[in-house]
């Protein structure tokens, strides 16, 4: 032990020769080295290493001391140091001696005490080798097991210096081998001065890390790191006086760097290191912040909607209108363009009437009352449902109901509509004459029109050659609720018109179900008896409508067939009273022989086609009359579903045919005919030919006229649009397959039975 203390003192006495002074250039590229590392524990642990192995490491510092040698090499260069001092004679002699000693010491396994790394040059190596063997003998027997045993490696102590053989020299790396007993170890020593190491081993030299806050972590170390630590200790040359075998805490911290678990790959709050530094340290566990989230723009789904739902919705047009509705819409649009002078007061009044009435109004029917005296140029229009014409003095009104409207469900209230003053018999004759002329014209027009049917709601006014101003337009609407509510709504509407200083207008509510007994008490004033009113009516009928006076039922029958009723008000010269009477005139060819007389004892509000006496006051009887009238009116146009039909242009269309069809806003689209409906009037005149079709590629169906359909295969070249893709092509493909399957035999089977 005295020799060990002497060596330690000598090492401390010469730090400037082979120690710190020579290590200054080497410390610059290794900023992670710790200055002042105590090499004493290394010296204390070297006692258990065999002699031949420790001498190899000891010779390098001694050989480098006499001249001004380069700084001590890194761990890999310790084995190369004998070659570096080859020109020196003393180093060669020592190398040969060590080789011989190592060969003799390997089988013996005798321990020796290696000298200090920074031994003074004055001390010759021969006395050290003679003095060292007896010193560590008390410790060696406990540490050295039999040579070649399984626990041979356990003799090595971390921090001890061993002698390795340099096999290959590669750029920035050394391949070395170490023989210990019967075992041979080989490895590669990497140059850590260039800031990279083997894969998976953290770089501890650069950058410098602070581990002083973790002194408790001290696991075992690897040889490579310890060799580098020994180099640092030699460079520093600082050896404390305390020869205790306890390692220095700073050395223990350095040892814990290698054997402790590597730090996690990401640390919360860790700064991003410079990019170049990361580039030089691939696959190293350098503290990194958590990875950033990569913002990827969401892919917009343009053409990836489900085809079954979206395409079906796209195929539906904005307004699916049949021929009937199209005609009415076109007529309304034309009338709106020309007759745009409807006052706001009339519209407001119309809305109030709708709100007050309990009856549910059909949405397709719109009441549009307009003030008299405006837009006289509208007299050139046709197809009036209800016509109210002014006589020269704007006192009397004539209401004409068209044959195309279901007047069995729409009876005008005469007690409200037909009230004016100072109407003489001559004016009454003029009224009847005008009514007959209009009825004849209307009958001729409707017989020649092809699209005339009972469901069309006409909105254009009829021409009135003798009127000074145009009358308001009246809509007929079906009666669906009780008559008392309708009466109240009519009364309020009339009072509002009177308060607004406007001429009385015909009401748009249906009063066919009113009790017949209400009219006399409301329409006749107490001062005017029924005899006077009846006499006035009789005078009018004698001049213009000759016929019997006792045929109210015959009158009702004729009216039920043709449904033309004329309501006229015959006002007396007295201003304080008025009486109303109703005369029904049919519009058939035998119009001149029709009966229109109304007796004074009868009600003035009976339906024109009533089969019962007008004096009946029960609501049930009037409702029965309405049902009979509606049944008789429905027979005017006969509709039948057929399986085969010939169009006016000579084409034969059958049920199941594949056709091209067109709807406004969409291209020509393939469709299949489901049903064919042919409507004719009672005289055999063709009204319409309509087909219900189903669209290919869509679950929707439509009603279209046969004139708007064209055969699929015959018109394929002219109808097919090559530019369209997607569902259009799919529908075309389905239609083509269906058309190929529709052979003449299949058509014959489909059309052999009439439905």
UniProtKB/Swiss-Prot annotation:
Record's keyword terms, sorted: Isopeptide bond, Nucleus, Phosphoprotein, Transcription, Transcription regulation, Ubl conjugation
Residue stretches of biased makeup (Pro residues): 64-76, 112-126
Region called Interaction with HDAC1 and MTA1, residue ranges: 148-373
Residue segments, region Interaction with the H2A.Z/H2AZ1: 423-574
Low complexity compositional bias, start-end: 1-15, 593-603
GO BP of this protein: chromatin remodeling; positive regulation of transcription elongation by RNA polymerase II; regulation of transcriptional start site selection at RNA polymerase II promoter
Pfam family, one: PWWP
UniProt domain PWWP: residue ranges: 655-715
Comp. bias intervals (Basic and acidic residues): 346-356, 368-381, 422-444
Gene3D superfamilies for this protein: 2.30.30.140
Repeat listed as a keyword: no
Region Disordered: start-end pairs: 1-153, 282-301, 334-384, 400-562, 578-626
Subunit note: Component of a MTA1-specific subcomplex of the NuRD complex (M1HR), composed of PWWP2A, MTA1/2, HDAC1/2, and RBBP4/7 but does not contain CHD4 and MBD3. Interacts with MTA1; the interaction mediates the association of PWWP2A with the M1HR complex. Interacts with H2A.Z/H2AZ1. Interacts (via PWWP domain) with histone H3 trimethylated at 'Lys-36' (H3K36me3). Does not interact with CHD4 and MBD3.
Name of the protein in question: PWWP domain-containing protein 2A
Species this protein is from: Homo sapiens
């Amino acid at each position: 032990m005295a020799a060990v203390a002497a060596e330690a003192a000598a090492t401390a006495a010469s730090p400037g020769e082979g120690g710190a002074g020579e290590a200054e250039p080497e410390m610059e590229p290794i900023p992670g080295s710790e200055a002042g590392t105590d090499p004493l524990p290394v010296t204390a642990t070297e006692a258990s290493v065999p002699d031949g192995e420790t001498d190899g490491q000891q010779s390098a510092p001694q050989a480098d001391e006499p001249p001004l040698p380069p700084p001590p090499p890194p761990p890999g260069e310790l084995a190369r140091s004998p070659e570096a001092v080859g020109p020196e004679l003393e180093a060669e002699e020592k190398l040969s001696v060590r080789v011989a000693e190592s060969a003799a010491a390997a089988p013996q396994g005798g321990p020796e005490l290696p000298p200090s790394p920074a031994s003074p040059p004055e001390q010759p190596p021969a006395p050290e080798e003679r003095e060292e063997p007896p010193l560590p003998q008390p410790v060696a027997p406990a540490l050295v097991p039999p040579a070649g045993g399984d626990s041979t490696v356990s003799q090595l102590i971390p921090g001890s210096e061993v002698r390795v053989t340099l096999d290959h020299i590669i750029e920035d790396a050394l391949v070395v081998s170490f023989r210990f007993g019967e075992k041979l170890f080989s490895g590669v020593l990497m140059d850590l001065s260039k800031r990279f190491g083997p894969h998976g081993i953290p770089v501890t030299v650069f950058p410098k890390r602070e581990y002083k806050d973790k002194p408790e972590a001290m696991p075992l170390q690897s040889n490579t790191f310890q060799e580098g630590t020994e180099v640092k200790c030699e460079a520093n040359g600082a050896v404390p006086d305390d020869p205790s075998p306890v390692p220095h805490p700073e050395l223990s911290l350095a040892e814990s760097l290698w054997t402790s678990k590597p730090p996690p790959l990401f640390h919360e709050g860790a700064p991003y290191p410079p990019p170049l530094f990361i580039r030089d340290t691939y696959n190293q566990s350098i503290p990194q912040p958590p990875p950033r989230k990569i913002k990827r723009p969401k892919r917009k789904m343009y053409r990836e909607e489900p085809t079954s739902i979206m395409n079906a919705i796209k195929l539906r047009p904005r307004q699916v209108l049949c021929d009937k509705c199209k005609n009415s819409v076109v007529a309304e649009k034309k009338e709106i363009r020309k007759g745009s002078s409807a006052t706001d007061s009339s519209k407001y009044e119309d809305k109030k009437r709708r709100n007050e009435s309990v009856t549910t109004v059909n949405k397709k029917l719109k009441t549009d009352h307009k003030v008299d005296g405006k837009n006289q140029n509208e007299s050139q229009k046709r197809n009036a449902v209800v016509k109210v014409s002014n006589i020269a003095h704007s006192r009397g009104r004539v209401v004409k109901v068209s044959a195309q409207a279901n007047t069995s469900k729409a009876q005008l209230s005469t007690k409200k509509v037909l009230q004016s003053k100072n109407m003489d018999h001559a004016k009454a004759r003029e009224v009847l004459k005008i009514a007959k002329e209009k009825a004849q014209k209307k009958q001729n027009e409707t017989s020649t029109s092809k699209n005339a049917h009972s469901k069309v709601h006409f909105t254009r006014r009829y021409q009135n050659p003798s009127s000074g101003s145009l009358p308001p337009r009246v809509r007929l609407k079906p009666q669906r609720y009780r008559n008392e509510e309708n009466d109240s709504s009519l009364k309020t509407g009339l009072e509002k018109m009177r308060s607004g200083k406007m001429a009385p207008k015909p009401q748009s509510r249906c009063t066919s179900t009113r009790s017949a007994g209400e009219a006399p008490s409301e329409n006749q004033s107490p001062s005017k008896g029924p005899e006077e009113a009846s006499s006035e009516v009789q005078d009018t009928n004698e001049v213009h409508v000759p016929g019997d006076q006792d045929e109210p039922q015959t009158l009702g029958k004729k009216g039920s067939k043709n449904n033309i009723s004329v309501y006229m008000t015959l006002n007396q010269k007295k201003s304080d009273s008025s009486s109303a009477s109703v005369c029904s005139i049919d519009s058939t060819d035998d119009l001149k022989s029709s009966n229109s007389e109304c007796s004074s004892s009868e009600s003035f509000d009976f339906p024109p086609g009533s089969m019962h006496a007008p004096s009946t006051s029960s609501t049930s009887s009037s409702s029965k009359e309405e049902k009979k009238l509606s049944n008789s009116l429905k027979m005017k146009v006969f509709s039948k579903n057929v399986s085969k039909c010939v169009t006016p242009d000579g084409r034969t269309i059958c049920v199941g045919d594949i056709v091209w069809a067109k709807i406004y806003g969409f291209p020509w689209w393939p469709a299949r005919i489901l049903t064919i409906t042919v409507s004719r009037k009672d005289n055999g005149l063709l009204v319409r030919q309509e087909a219900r079709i189903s669209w290919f590629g869509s679950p929707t169906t439509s009603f279209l006229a046969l004139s708007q359909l064209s055969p699929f295969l015959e018109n394929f070249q002219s109808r097919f649009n090559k530019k369209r893709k997607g569902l259009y092509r799919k529908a075309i493909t389905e239609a083509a397959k269906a058309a190929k399957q529709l052979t003449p035999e299949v058509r014959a089977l489909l059309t052999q039975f009439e439905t």
